[in-house]
């Protein structure tokens, strides 16, 4: 049984906004952020790319070579070629942001690229924005 949360309505509103930006969701541990995002993703997108930086440390190299969306997507595809990146129909979900805060730098470039929606999630205990190399104004 799924317990509907406030975040569910927020995610629906975000999806309806044609000018949506990459989304960072932060909150306490173990409150259902990942479960809510995952449920939303599979109900609304044809393709879901979920990367958990705790469970899959190998993805911490996806910004090698640059933070632009094309480079990040290329590096993800090199690690797991089975994932489908379908423009306009794919959500990229970066979970456990606090373990790889550098990925936040790429969000500006995903916004400019515009082909894919992006949601990041992380715990308040671990997110330290002063550890992020570059902070783009208007994208946090």
Functional labels for PLM-detected ranges:
Residues 1-140:
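Phosphate-binding site recognition
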């Amino acid at each position: 049984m799924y317990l509907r949360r406030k975040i569910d309505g927020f995610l629906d509103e975000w999806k309806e906004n044609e000018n949506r930006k990459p989304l960072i969701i932060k909150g306490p541990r173990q409150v259902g952020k990942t479960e809510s995002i995952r449920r939303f993703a599979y109900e609304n997108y044809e393709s879901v790319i979920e990367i958990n930086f705790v469970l899959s440390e190998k993805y911490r190299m996806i910004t090698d070579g640059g933070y632009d969306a094309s480079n990040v997507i290329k590096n993800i595809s090199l690690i797991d070629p089975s994932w489908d990146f379908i423009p306009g129909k794919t959500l990229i979900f970066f979970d456990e942001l606090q373990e790889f805060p550098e990925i936040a730098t790429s969000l500006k470039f995903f916004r400019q690229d515009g082909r894919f929606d992006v949601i990041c999630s992380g715990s308040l205990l671990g997110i330290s924005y002063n550890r992020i190399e570059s902070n783009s104004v208007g994208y946090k």
